[in-house]
Amino acid sequence: MAKFSKGQISIELILLMTAVLLAGILVSVNMTRFTFEGDILSDVREDAFQVFEISTDTPIIVYSLNFSNVKISPSTNLYNAWLQINDTGNDTYLWYYSDGTFKGLANTSDPDESITEENLVLLPHEGYASDIIFRSNVPTAMSWDSYEIDFNDIKKFEIIANDVENNPISYSLTHGDSPETSNQAYLNIKANEVTIIVTKANDKVFEVIANTTSGTIELLPYTETSP
């Protein structure tokens, strides 16, 4: 039977206790790291909020949007078209007529370009867009998940896709029940993850946001930022 002196026992005991303590610390660190990373990953929802340039504590809602049969009238001025569709195919469509004669949906990105038959697109027409701008007599209020906003003094809407590559705006334009020669068209929009910008009659521009604290839809002053 081996014999140990008191000094040997003390040193070996210290070494043994140190080894056990270090092993415990390593296990604790590994468990903490796993738990921490797991919590972070489970709580983060990608694109749940948009970072807004102005100072506000109000979360910006990522909307899923569905507009059906929004009535669009033609415009004589391409700079102020009642409908502008920026298609993902790099085409720009404007709802347009000239000199009192109905022309149609013009495929042009240049407001100074003269509209010819070659520029016109017959309805129905559908596609995917990065953003859509329209002026229309929309319903007096818009609701989203029990939130509601009065649009009485809104003169222009801009719907912008937040992720064009994966979630472009799906749109279609038809004459509805009207004849093909009608100067009215009806716009249908389906989209996920969009930003809604509105311009009031006084030309002030706002972003539509949902205030989850007060349970209302509000308008925040909008400042366009460079991409």
Curated annotation (Swiss-Prot):
Signal peptide: none annotated. Induction: Expressed under standard laboratory conditions at 35 degrees Celsius. Keywords: Fimbrium, Secreted. A motif (QXSXEXXXL) lies at residues 8-16. Residues 1-7 form a propeptide. InterPro entries: Class3_signal_pept_motif (IPR007166). The lineage of its organism: Archaea, Methanobacteriati, Methanobacteriota, Methanomada group, Methanococci. One of its GO terms (cellular component) is membrane. Contains an amino terminal motif QXSXEXXXL, which is part of a class III signal sequence. Transmembrane segments: none annotated. Disruption phenotype: Disruption of the gene does not change the piliation compared with the parent cells. The keyword Secreted applies. Its main location: secreted. This is Probable minor pilin MMP0600. It comes from Methanococcus maripaludis (strain DSM 14266 / JCM 13030 / NBRC 101832 / S2 / LL). The keyword Secreted applies. The N-terminus is probably cleaved by the prepilin peptidase EppA, which recognizes the class III signal sequence.
